[in-house]
Amino acid sequence: MAQSTNKSSMVAKLLAVLGPGLFLIGYNIGTGSVTTMASAGSRWGMSLTWTVVLSCLFTYIGLFAFSRYTLVTGDTILYAIKQRFPMGRPIAFFIMSAVIFAEFFSLTGLMAISVDLLHEWIKYASGYYHAGIKLALTISLSAMLYILLWSGEYRLLEKILAALVMIMGISFLLTALLVVPSWREIFAGLIPGVPHEQGAALLVAGMAGTTFSSAILYCRSITLKAKGWRLAEQKKSLIDTVVSVGMMFLLSIAIMICAAGTLYTMNKPVENAIDMVRTLEPLAGQFAISLFIIGIVGAGVSSLIPTILIAPWVISDYTHTEINPHSKQSRIFVSLGVVVCLIGPYLRTNPVILMILTMALLAVILPLSTIAITILLNQKQLGEHKNGTGMNIACMGAILFSLIMSYYGVMGLQAYFN
């Protein structure tokens, strides 16, 4: 009995330490990650490994920086920008608006891929096809999201979805071990370079945007403040960040390896959502389609919930008010988010391309956030907690990386729409 109590206590302590990080993993490891990493691996093997490594490295630096400011001052970042920058109010308002727009745009891709895969699964399992099924799936998923978010009772569903995503994540890790390419290929992919092919710049920006995004950084600050963490919890925050980013890296690189070891060797790049099923075939065989679709739809829905909630969260950051899921403002944005979800599957764009476009857009707006946090961490009122030389070098690296990814994103989006 005592042993059981000790185990429960250990689990409780682990969850307490990883609280904010679990949100980040749930938000980050979803449809966007699977789509971009699988697309990259299927087209160019392991040659874009450097993008995953640098994205995760600078995600860690960004999370550390945003966490540090909130732990020291107790302020969230948008509010700090509004209060402490010259022209801070319009700058913070622009960042808030850009994050909301980018996240709402990403809802279209998340819902489009989820509906597309469920539709294909029903056709595969039953042999029956009807255009009305897609509409029924779209309305059903949107209605479920609306009811859950309106009531605020979605914790149980989140746990179920997290379990499904975990199964998919473990499946990718195990498959990666079966099809892992040579170390020579992996190390060659650590040398930065972008393939001279159409869509390469857009995909590189999308890979960065799905990992190192402004939304994750601001949500990190908001969740720390909501938990009441201050400098006394700095060690817990650091452990939480390391574990979260470590899991992001492992799962992202595993997905790329799976695609490189299956689709790339067959010369079958991901063109449609259903193509990604093949990445799990070495492990699951004929069950790959069911395993993949259950996992990625779980990942999609688990990403839809925090993506819709980001709008009221960043508004509460900007206005320096408590997060209230039952407020009129929150419910307006929940309603808008669900309407966007309804539209997603019917946009005249391939769901895979749509998902990559939305991830690239997140990379485009990143530089403002990295520049802002670097300035905030160098202000006099932080005293001994100001950035030292090492942290400033790290922040400058994050700024440079975000500018390069933003450039790739702009060029990629421009090329696509032209």
Regions found by a protein language model. Give the residues of each.
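Extracellular loop-to-transmembrane helix junctions
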Residues: 12, 39-64, 81, 87-91
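Extracellular/periplasmic helix-exit of transmembrane alpha-helices
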Residues: 61-72, 224, 246-275
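Membrane-interface loop-to-helix entry segments
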Residues: 140, 144, 148-179, 359-366, ...
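Hydrophobic alpha-helical segments and their helix-loop junctions in multi-pass secondary transporters
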Residues: 166-193, 201-205, 210-221, 370-382, ...
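Hydrophobic transmembrane alpha-helices that form the core helical bundles
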Residues: 90-126, 300-319, 351-353, 403
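Transmembrane-helix boundary/entry motifs in multi-pass membrane transporters
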Residues: 7-11, 45, 72-101, 124, ...
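Transmembrane alpha-helical segments of multi-pass small-molecule transport proteins
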Residues: 96, 122-150, 167-173, 324-343, ...
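Flexible loop linkers connecting adjacent transmembrane helices
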Residues: 2-4, 36-39, 65-88, 122, ...
